[in-house]
UniProtKB/Swiss-Prot annotation:
A single Gene Ontology CC term: cytosolic small ribosomal subunit
CDD domains cross-referenced by the UniProt entry: bS6
Classification via SUPFAM superfamilies: Ribosomal protein S6 (SSF54995)
InterPro entries in the record: Ribosomal_bS6, Ribosomal_bS6_CS, Ribosomal_bS6_sf, Ribosomal_S6_plastid/chlpt, Transl_elong_EF1B/ribsomal_bS6
GO biological process terms on file: translation
Pfam families: Ribosomal_S6
Name of the protein this chain belongs to: Small ribosomal subunit protein bS6
Protein family: Belongs to the bacterial ribosomal protein bS6 family.
Protein keywords: Ribonucleoprotein, Ribosomal protein, RNA-binding, rRNA-binding
Function: Binds together with bS18 to 16S ribosomal RNA.
GO MF terms, alphabetically ordered: small ribosomal subunit rRNA binding; structural constituent of ribosome
Lineage, top ranks: Bacteria, Pseudomonadati, Pseudomonadota, Gammaproteobacteria, Pasteurellales
Coiled-coil parts of chain: none
Length: 124
């Protein structure tokens, strides 16, 4: 089985359906004997340029190990799901399990905020 990195963007009005979509897509990978190595829900983010007059979208990143037929099935699901604005499926050489730069940046912001609050409390 090959390793793939999958990113898809969902219409912002359909954000509440994203967990169900993720569950459906991960279930199809696991049913075929594949494995999900990394799953990140980046949430609603600003688009670089408008798509269908939209300026925001809900982003999801998945790193999976799956047979080609499952990837073809996912691609078909993305194509015929009106809620999915864009998708990208890239073949990778190995499984990627470390956190993406998006998550690392978010974690560092949280750590900075916590440190700032602690320093303010210590200064009182």
């Amino acid at each position: 089985m090959r390793h793939y990195e999958i990113v898809f963007m969902v219409h912002p009005d359909q954000s509440e359906q994203v967990p169900a979509m993720i569950e459906r897509y991960t279930a199809s990978v696991k049913e075929a004997g594949g494995q999900v190595h990394r799953l990140e829900d980046w949430g609603r983010r600003q688009l670089a340029y408008p798509i269908n007059k939209l300026h925001k979208a809900h982003y999801v990143l998945m790193n999976v190990e799956a047979p080609q037929r499952v990837i073809d099935e996912l691609e078909t699901n993305f194509r015929y799901n009106d809620a999915v604005l864009r998708n990208l499926i890239v073949h990778t050489k190995a499984a990627v399990t470390e956190a993406s730069p998006m998550v690392k940046a978010k974690e560092s912001k949280v750590a900075e905020a916590v440190a700032e609050v602690e320093s303010e409390e210590a200064g009182e």
